[in-house]
């Protein structure tokens, strides 16, 4: 069936409110505290249900909070997708990790040349971009291989973990180095610098110069001392300035010709810029004063097709995702988001497919250039809505997928007032989108990829809560008379439900289920 044969409403708009979780808790809940007349009306008058967006429901370990990458993979995939975190942890448990060909080959090169192995990675138990147990497993593997010079360049979290929580991970890995009698943490830097994904290359340059030249704002004898120094400066883990760890009479440990680098982040989006700085022969984003000629550069997972590195855990291929399935049937699609979430409504929603499918257009709205988004909680939501309303009225597309980044990106700052303002901006944008849809006979499914903004303070740590949550997320249908089933669904049910509303059978690859019945 093509859209020409289908009399279902057009366009269908899938609206993803990034970081918008459901919680009965009203204290420190920016969503409940915000003035949201549009959302209140939608929940009162339109069918809605709740979806699981964490743990096993999205291919993660029990209790592991969801994230944007995983959320969009499941929304677009319509099936349970084993996540890299789960795959790599399983490989460690089974022993396969210690026989991984890409890792073994790189380590053997370092051993043969008597060169150093430099481990880059987010040293964090967060499980969103990395997990510290996996870094520890690589340290163990390097030790087993007889590597004498093992250096960890620790990127600190404080975003998917409490703002000041890095010490435990630092102490654990330091104890491991001491037990082996070789290796050390060579540098510290906050993810704000080392893991930018919005082409703020001045931040990436600071990380690159720390790694290749030892250019540091601070120097410390130990990693713990370096962390305490950052806290004294008023910085939380995320914002730790470039810090070199070495004795006062020694030169900083840097990545040199012949060395091996292993980047231990399993999530690609925030690992790409730093990787390009090392590997791109035509790199122009900043002037690389030093470019080491490496024996090997290994990435834990595949970061991008144009990044030519050995990959320890290649991606699983997904076929007949929502985008691919609709494309094959001649449907026209649009993906629209601002910079911070553009990859999620394109690459991740398409199951790791970089190029658009036939009939799929993409529109990128630039995110504002501010240090942190609490300074501009509206981000680019209004500009995106202006374009979206215009596009809806032009009636060019069968399916439009858009992502509002504000609840997640502002929620990550831990600023409750700013996050509340962000929610209120989104509420006003939703009103305009729904009004435009109803004027042309279109419909909407509104959901989220994971929670965040509904929990802004952590009573246990007595710190602002900047991480995602494991809460359920909403699914609201704005269209014809319908009823959701009583059971709680999951994110992989969104695509089958959407296809049902568009008058289509789901493909056999989609194991998620339709959650709604039209009356």
Curated annotation (Swiss-Prot):
Source superkingdom: Bacteria
Pfam families per the UniProt record, alphabetical: iPGM_N, Metalloenzyme
Pathway: Carbohydrate degradation; glycolysis; pyruvate from D-glyceraldehyde 3-phosphate: step 3/5
Cofactor(s) needed by this chain: Mn(2+)
Annotated keywords: Glycolysis, Isomerase, Manganese, Metal-binding
Catalytic site positions: 68 (phosphoserine intermediate)
Binding site for substrate: 129, 159-160, 191, 197, 267-270, 341
Annotated GO biological process: carbohydrate metabolic process; glucose catabolic process; glycolytic process
Protein name: 2,3-bisphosphoglycerate-independent phosphoglycerate mutase
Gene Ontology CC: one annotated term: cytosol
Gene3D superfamilies attached to this UniProt entry: Alkaline Phosphatase, subunit A, BPG-independent phosphoglycerate mutase, domain B
Residues reported to bind Mn(2+) 1: 408, 412, 468
Function statement: Catalyzes the interconversion of 2-phosphoglycerate and 3-phosphoglycerate.
The keyword Metal-binding is assigned to this record: yes
Sites where the protein binds Mn(2+) 2: 18, 68, 449-450
GO molecular function: manganese ion binding; phosphoglycerate mutase activity
Enzyme Commission designation: 5.4.2.12
Family the entry assigns: Belongs to the BPG-independent phosphoglycerate mutase family.
PANTHER family (UniProt xref): 2,3-BISPHOSPHOGLYCERATE-INDEPENDENT PHOSPHOGLYCERATE MUTASE
Reactions accelerated catalytically: (2R)-2-phosphoglycerate = (2R)-3-phosphoglycerate
Quaternary structure and partners: Monomer.
InterPro entries found in the cross-reference section: Alkaline_phosphatase_core_sf (IPR017850), BPG-indep_PGM_N (IPR011258), Metalloenzyme (IPR006124), PGAM_B_sf (IPR036646), Pgm_bpd_ind (IPR005995)
